[in-house]
């Protein structure tokens, strides 16, 4: 029999989340398991967006695609799941971010030892009374039941057989699979052992799952025993914390509740005094704050695609639930700081990445608050009409016009007991797609259709361009002037398919080669090369002679162009390596362009790269160039390449055998492009621009090799022209421009002051025109040729002269010759404000008559418009509206 808990072991059992995690890892480390660090939430697996299970990092090992790290391993793996996000905060145990404790055997121990250790850990280390435990087994797994009953000593009534849907694990329709056994905690053992229903979530919680991988399933569904059987287990850290800390749900454990308390403090509420709706919002904030912090830490940035969209959705849910609690100011950074403080012990990388995490939280919250304010206003108008549902058209308007996520509309509607017409939403989305198609510029698809037609019948082109730039090739297909053909003559635009080619076809960000196809009295100038289904299509024009199907031609790549493309491509690899070293190791490629004269690299990064960092990157790259690193290019299995540390672009599909381009000690990437043989061939590298191209995506543009000299020569010309213009030496230009800017600034201030004085002087004569309306002094006048600051000064001066009952409105054209710009200002005294009239609201409404708007403080405000012809009518309206308001008082 396996040892069970005693009262003393229960008293000394781990309690905190940190202790529970460490106890698990130590228990298995003492039993020969290698402690493995948590893998990133961004998995090295193109089939999933995020790490969703503790076994995912070991999946290649279980599938026989990768060498095992050790016969036995144990880990605490960070995981994210969002498939049931709507249940977060509403149930006791649903989360987006969670930690999965696991022990793994790769062809080492199997079922009996896994069961014995799981029981020993649960009862002996964690001190759980066996009376509180129930186990499940697969309905056909007699072996597991016997071990639980006869070896461990579990009461047979507390061993429950389950169907395949619950207790049989498979990696997919085919492949390794096997039965599993789960351990449940019973919160109500006093109810006895009869008619146990493990689906009763109020009574039972599953906390430890043991998977026995012992079969291989083929396409026919036949199960064959595996030669090497494996163990894959998972224990939910948050669930065990709930059990040992004796709290009603996972959220009230020390792993999450500090974040709930932080949110409650921000909202000024007491968690324990809130209703269920309020508690749910706090739980969502607590859960999601952990998730977004870990996602950003591992390199995810908010976007509208893939895992970036998951991050954005979680962030926006946090903000919205904060608003439901009355938090009307930005607070994500505060929650991020609280999450970092909570997570840093087990996950020190959050401290290393703190600046990046907080910057992304701040940026995305600011972006969403604008969206939320617009969308909530429109949605409130919709709900005010008390509809039976939110129509598809309304949901689409929120999405399309205001950037309001459909999921958020669904959540808000659900809170009001309403549904969203999803079919109508999809119909509106499809209508927009069709409108976009109809409005788009018509594209002549005849050429592409012709190319597709000839390519469909061709075998893959044999590419010889890594080793040779000249090759004798046979013409396999021709497209001439937009249609399939057997011949092409001088002057014809032509697309040529060859059996073998030295020309690189556009791909991987690199442009296709240029060159010629030559023969006896034949020249075909090739301007670009593309690929379609591994068939290379050479596009160009026949300059001399005639080309026919079956001809043998000499395919010659333009060597100068190829050299420049090679230099730029290798420089792009060096750029990514330098960015990882200088800016952030988590930087990942989002796209690239390798042209003959320039290169462009897009990468995931939440903030702009600073000028100092750009200088460091540039210096580092030129240092690697000067060090003359010889490149090593080889083909190897994809798993071997990744194990060696080769960088792959996420989302890119790779073959089983890949090409690895290695700059030893600097960079190693999977790449099918062409490269220099030594970094010294690049010559020079120069960054010319850094910018943002999308949310969380930065772009660096650069030149390399001879293009650097051309770039510097252009800059020299500009510097010389500036020097001549400002009569200054190159080193003096910056100071000279700065001095001129200061002079201009001072002149501008003096001019503004003079204009303000002039406006006040002009206004002085207007005070006598004020009209007494009851206890108020009303003055509405036009004053052209004065800017906004001048009009404000004049209005305020007049209001001061007229006293507390003053209401002054002045409108004018700052440039009397420009009818497209109107300025309106209002200045109200305290007596007017006390009568519930505010300058900001009033002048904003008047400005609408001039096609504009604006506002400001209750006592002084400015608005603008675009229709000067409407100004007289707007001033008349102001006079009438204020007169009526004053007489009504």
Swiss-Prot record:
> What are the UniProt keywords, alphabetically?
Aminoacyl-tRNA synthetase, ATP-binding, Cytoplasm, Ligase, Metal-binding, Nucleotide-binding, Protein biosynthesis, RNA-binding, tRNA-binding, Zinc
- Gene Ontology terms for molecular function: alanine-tRNA ligase activity; aminoacyl-tRNA deacylase activity; ATP binding; tRNA binding; zinc ion binding
Query: Where along the chain is Zn(2+) bound?
Result: 569, 573, 671, 675
GO cellular component term, pick one: cytosol
Q: Which reaction does it catalyse?
A: tRNA(Ala) + L-alanine + ATP = L-alanyl-tRNA(Ala) + AMP + diphosphate
Q: What class of enzyme is it?
A: ligase
GO BP terms in the entry: alanyl-tRNA aminoacylation
Q: Name any cofactors this protein relies on.
A: Zn(2+)
Primary location class: cytoplasm
Quote the cofactor binding remark.
Binds 1 zinc ion per subunit.
Compartments it resides in: Cytoplasm
Highest taxon listed in the record's lineage: Bacteria
- Entry EC number(s): 6.1.1.7
Q: Which family does it belong to?
A: Belongs to the class-II aminoacyl-tRNA synthetase family.
Per its UniProt record, what HAMAP family does this chain match? Ala_tRNA_synth_B
Record's domain comment?
Answer: Consists of three domains; the N-terminal catalytic domain, the editing domain and the C-terminal C-Ala domain. The editing domain removes incorrectly charged amino acids, while the C-Ala domain, along with tRNA(Ala), serves as a bridge to cooperatively bring together the editing and aminoacylation centers thus stimulating deacylation of misacylated tRNAs.
- Protein name from the UniProt record: Alanine--tRNA ligase
Q: Tell me the organism.
A: Synechococcus sp. (strain CC9605)
């Amino acid at each position: 029999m396996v040892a069970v808990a005693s009262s003393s072991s229960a008293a000394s059992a781990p309690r905190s989340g940190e202790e529970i995690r460490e106890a698990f890892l130590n228990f298995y480390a003492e039993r020969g398991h290698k402690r493995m660090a948590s893998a990133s939430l961004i998995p090295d697996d193109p089939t999933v967006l995020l790490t969703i299970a503790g076994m995912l990092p070991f999946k290649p090992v279980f599938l026989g695609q990768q060498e095992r790290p050790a016969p036995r391993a144990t880990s605490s793996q960070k995981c994210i799941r969002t498939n049931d996000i709507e249940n977060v905060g509403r149930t006791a145990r649903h989360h987006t971010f969670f930690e999965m404790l696991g022990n793994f055997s790769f062809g080492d121990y199997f079922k009996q030892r896994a069961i014995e250790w799981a029981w020993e850990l649960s009862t002996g280390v964690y001190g759980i009374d066996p009376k509180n435990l129930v186990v499940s087994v697969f309905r056909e797994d007699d072996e597991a039941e016997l071990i639980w009953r006869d070896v461990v000593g579990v009461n047979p009534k507390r061993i429950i057989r389950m169907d395949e849907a619950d207790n049989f694990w498979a990696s997919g329709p085919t492949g390794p699979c096997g039965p599993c056994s789960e351990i449940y905690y019973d919160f109500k053992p006093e109810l006895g052992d009869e008619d146990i229903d493990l689906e009763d979530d109020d009574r039972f919680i599953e906390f430890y799952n043991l998977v026995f991988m012992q079969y291989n399933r083929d396409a026919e569904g036949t199960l064959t025993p595996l030669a090497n059987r494996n163990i894959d287990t998972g224990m939910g850290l948050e669930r065990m914390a709930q059990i040992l800390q004796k709290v009603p749900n996972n959220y009230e454990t020390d792993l999450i509740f500090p974040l709930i308390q932080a949110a409650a403090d921000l909202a000024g509420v007491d968690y324990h005094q809130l209703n269920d709706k309020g508690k749910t919002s706090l739980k969502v904030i607590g859960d999601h704050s952990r998730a977004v912090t870990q996602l950003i830490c591992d390199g995810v940035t908010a976007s509208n695609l893939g895992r970036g969209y998951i991050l954005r959705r979680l962030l926006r849910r946090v903000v919205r639930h904060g608003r439901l609690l009355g938090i009307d100011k930005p607070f994500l950074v505060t929650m991020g700081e609280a999450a970092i403080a909570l997570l840093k012990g087990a996950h020190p990388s959050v401290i290393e990445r703190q600046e990046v995490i907080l910057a992304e939280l701040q940026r995305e919250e600011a972006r969403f608050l604008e969206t939320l304010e617009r969308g909530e206003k429109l949605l409130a108008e919709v709900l005010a009409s008390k509809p039976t549902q939110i129509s598809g058209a309304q949901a689409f308007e929120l999405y399309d016009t205001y950037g309001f996520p459909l999921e958020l509309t669904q959540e808000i509607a659900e809170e009001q007991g309403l549904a969203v017409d999803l079919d109508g939403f999809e119909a509106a989305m499809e209508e927009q797609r069709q409108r976009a198609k109809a409005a788009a510029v018509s594209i002549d698809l005849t050429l592409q259709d012709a190319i597709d037609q000839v390519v469909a019948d061709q075998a893959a082109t044999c590419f010889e361009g890594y080793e040779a730039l000249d090759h004798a090739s046979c013409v396999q297909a021709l497209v001439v002037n937009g249609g399939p053909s057997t011949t092409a003559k001088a002057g014809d635009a032509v697309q040529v398919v060859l059996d073998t080619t030295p020309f690189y076809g556009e791909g991987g960000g690199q442009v296709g080669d240029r060159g010629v196809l030559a023969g006896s009295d034949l020249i075909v100038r090739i301007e670009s090369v593309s690929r379609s289904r591994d068939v290379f299509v050479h596009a160009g024009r026949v300059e001399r002679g005639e080309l026919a199907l079956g001809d043998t031609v000499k395919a010659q790549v333009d060597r100068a162009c190829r050299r420049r493309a090679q230099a730029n491509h290798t420089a792009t690899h060096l750029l990514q390596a330098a960015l990882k070293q200088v800016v952030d190791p988590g930087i990942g490629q989002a796209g690239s362009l390798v042209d003959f004269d320039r290169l462009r690299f897009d990468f995931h990064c939440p903030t702009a790269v600073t000028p100092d960092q750009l200088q460091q990157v540039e210096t580092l790259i030129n240092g690697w160039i000067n060090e003359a690193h010889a490149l090593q290019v080889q083909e190897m299995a994809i798993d071997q390449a990744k194990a060696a540390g080769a960088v792959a672009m996420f989302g890119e599909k790779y073959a089983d055998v890949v090409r690895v381009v290695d700059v030893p000690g600097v960079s190693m990437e999977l790449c099918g492009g062409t490269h220099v043989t030594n970094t010294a061939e690049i010559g020079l590298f120069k960054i010319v621009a850094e910018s943002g191209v999308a949310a969380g995506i930065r772009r660096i543009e650069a030149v390399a090799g001879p293009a650097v000299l051309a770039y510097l020569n252009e800059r020299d010309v500009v510097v010389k022209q500036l020097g001549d213009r400002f009569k200054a030496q190159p080193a003096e230009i910056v100071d000279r421009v700065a001095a001129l800017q200061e002079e201009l600034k001072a002149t501008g201030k003096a001019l503004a002051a003079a204009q303000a004085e002039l406006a006040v002087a002009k206004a002085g004569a207007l005070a006598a025109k004020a009209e007494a309306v009851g206890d108020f002094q009303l003055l509405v006048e036009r004053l052209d040729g004065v800017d906004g600051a001048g009009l404000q000064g004049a209005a305020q001066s007049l209001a001061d002269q007229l006293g507390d009952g003053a209401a002054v409105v002045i409108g004018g054209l700052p440039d009397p010759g420009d009818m497209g710009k109107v300025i309106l200002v209002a200045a109200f005294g305290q007596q007017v404000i006390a009568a519930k009239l505010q300058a900001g609201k009033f002048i904003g409404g008047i400005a609408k008559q001039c096609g504009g708007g604006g506002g400001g403080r209750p006592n002084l405000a400015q608005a603008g418009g675009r229709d000067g012809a409407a100004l007289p009518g707007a001033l008349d309206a102001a006079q009438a509206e204020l007169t009526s308001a004053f007489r009504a008082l």
